[in-house]
Each structure stands twice: as structure tokens, then as C-alpha cells.
Amino acid sequence: MDFLLRYATTQTSVGVQTNRIVVNTTRIAHAYGYEPTIMTFQRNMTMTLSPVLGDGRHSYRPLDAHPASGMLQHRHGPLNFFFNAELSRLSWYTYDNHPSLDELEERFQKILNTPPMNRWLVLYLISQANMAFCLLFGGDLVSGLFVFLGTFCGFLLRQELNRRHVYHYLTVVLSAFVASFVVGLGAKFGYEEFPKIALSASVLYLIPGVPFINGMMDILDGYVLNGISRLLTAVMIVVSITVGLSVTLMSLGLSLL
């Protein structure tokens, strides 16, 4: 029970949609002869485990079975597609090989202890990607360079604020403001040929694409409350981005219209 709750809530923290969390967790439970009933919410997860006999579609619950229930709060962490893939792979390994609980825990901890990608490399790649978006949308090279610099400063601030556990939406507001303000300075002093494109591209790295996608997938999979919750979270992030960008526009007397 303890392992399954930690396994499931870890998946939530790294950006896995609800249906995949339920399927992966159920797969592991079946490998050890249990049938889970899982309820997921925005902040916690509840699970009930019932022992079953048999295998596959012919399993049944004994009359003297005593289900056990537990609840655990979701963990908080950044999106991590490596964890997403490895945790899913762990569920298949468990289903096919039936390892001991000690081995399963060891493999789980090995995944969690995987060192993250170098933060400076991530910072450079995201800045480069945002610059590429600016050029792709028709911006000039100078505008792209300002977007690179603005994204670098904004994302660096976001990394530092996240390390200090600053309120999430405030972090987004400040990051959007810093990134757009750096780009706005280039527009204010006439260095950029396409300032509107540059300003629009400067905050693209903050767009919550995964929450939007997961929210829609949850709704389509029937997890309507979870989907709405994720979509509302994504909308709040977009509102925070808008606030940060609006402060820049008002401060520098610029407009996107």
C-alpha cells in the first residue's frame, strides 16, 4: 500500500495523466495479487487494496478478504518525461518478472535518485528554443537575440524562486515580467524591427502546455474533476503570464495591438 501510494503520487508530480497513473499502479498491484480502487484528487490520492485469487480475467475476491485503505498527498516537482517513461517501464517490469518488494523499492529509488539535467544546459536550450520561436514567427535576428537574453534572465529567476519555494503563481508573474521587460527595453529603444513578435515570444517558455493536454485527456478518459482541476491550474498560469507581461507593457508604454 505504502509503495503504491508513493509510486502513484510521484507520477502525478512529474506530469502523468490520470488514466496512465491508474493503469500503471493497477498493473503493479495485479502482479502481487491485489485489486486496487483508486481515487485521485488535486492534492491527494486515496487507494483501497483488496486481495484477489486467480489470474487475469478469472480472478475473484475471497469472501474473507480484508481490504486496506490509505491516503497520501501528491508530491510537488517539476515535469520530468524521463521519470514518466521509467516509472511506466517499472510497472511492466514488475508485471512480467514479479520481483521482491525490496527489489521493487530499490529500482524505484534508483529512478528517483537519477541526477537531473544540468540546470545551465536547460537554461541555454530553453533560451535557444524561445529565440527560435521568435525567428520562426517572422522576427529579425536582433529581436531573436533579445528574446534569448530575456528568456535566459526570466528562466534563471524562475529556477531560483522555485529553489526557494516561492508561491508558484507569483513565480510565473515575476518570470514573465523579467523576460518581457528585457525584450521590451530593446523595443523601447528601437533596436528591434518586430517588437510585437519579440514580446509575444518572450513568455512562450511559461505556457503550460502539459497541464492543458493532461486536462483534456483526463476529461476524455472520464476523469472529469481531475481534468477540470488541471485546466483551471493551466488557466491560472496563463493569467499570471498575462499579469507579468501587462506590467511590462504599462511600465514601458508599449502595446501588442
Give the location of each predicted region.
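C-terminal ends of transmembrane helices
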Residues: 107-111, 154-165, 211-226
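Generic detector of multi-pass transmembrane helix bundles and their immediately adjacent loops
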Residues: 187-257
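Soluble N-terminal domains of membrane-associated systems
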Residues: 1-99
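Alpha-helical transmembrane segments and their cytosolic membrane-interface
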Residues: 76-143, 233-242, 253
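Electropositive phosphate-/nucleotide-binding environments in soluble metabolic enzymes
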Residues: 2, 15, 19, 77-84, ...
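Core alpha-helical transmembrane segments of integral membrane proteins
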Residues: 115-189, 193
